[in-house]
């Protein structure tokens, strides 16, 4: 069975934490296809600071050394907000016989009940939840705990060989980097070069983004 991983985010900007997390995931799971999915107008996050075109360009630059990583722009090409359920339905129509796995952060798992038609997500894809220790102390919503009790399975072969319906928690390493922090530091003219791929850093400086 062809296995597909979908890593969604605003990537505003894409940073080394995104890359290192993805490399760790691929080293452990080895998905046949791995897509970075830039979001358009996230329904439960503030609007992005860079344009869609700029965010895609930064992704292209960041992923140049990693030809196995692809970019999927279907959310940007849509005229509606970024509802993941629509995106997964689109993937499922295109890849009817494949295993689909949506990669989300632990904070995304806690916020899952806020997602549009969130109950349908698990029927369309597996969930690979990236553990982040700072969220472990937060209470898990009852609806999410019920979901975990029913669908959690940390056997990686389940994700690779089942169309949908499993949740796996995985520690991909801890990287103290966030797009929000990078934007704030750039605005304060602080050095962020070590947190960004070199080509992305050069692009941000050239475009004078996040100033």
UniProtKB/Swiss-Prot annotation:
The reaction(s) this protein catalyses: nicotinate beta-D-ribonucleotide + ATP + H(+) = deamido-NAD(+) + diphosphate
Biological pathway: Cofactor biosynthesis; NAD(+) biosynthesis; deamido-NAD(+) from nicotinate D-ribonucleotide: step 1/1
UniProt entry tagged with the keyword Kinase: no
Superkingdom of the organism of origin: Bacteria
SUPFAM superfamilies: Nucleotidylyl transferase
UniProt KW keywords: ATP-binding, NAD, Nucleotide-binding, Nucleotidyltransferase, Pyridine nucleotide biosynthesis, Transferase
One Pfam entry name: CTP_transf_like
Record's keyword annotation contains NAD: yes
Gene3D superfamilies, A to Z: HUPs
Any one GO molecular function term: ATP binding
One annotated GO biological process: NAD biosynthetic process
Enzyme nomenclature, EC number: 2.7.7.18
Function: Catalyzes the reversible adenylation of nicotinate mononucleotide (NaMN) to nicotinic acid adenine dinucleotide (NaAD).
Family per record: Belongs to the NadD family.
HAMAP family hit by this protein: NaMN_adenylyltr
Protein name: Probable nicotinate-nucleotide adenylyltransferase
Species of the source: Legionella pneumophila (strain Paris)
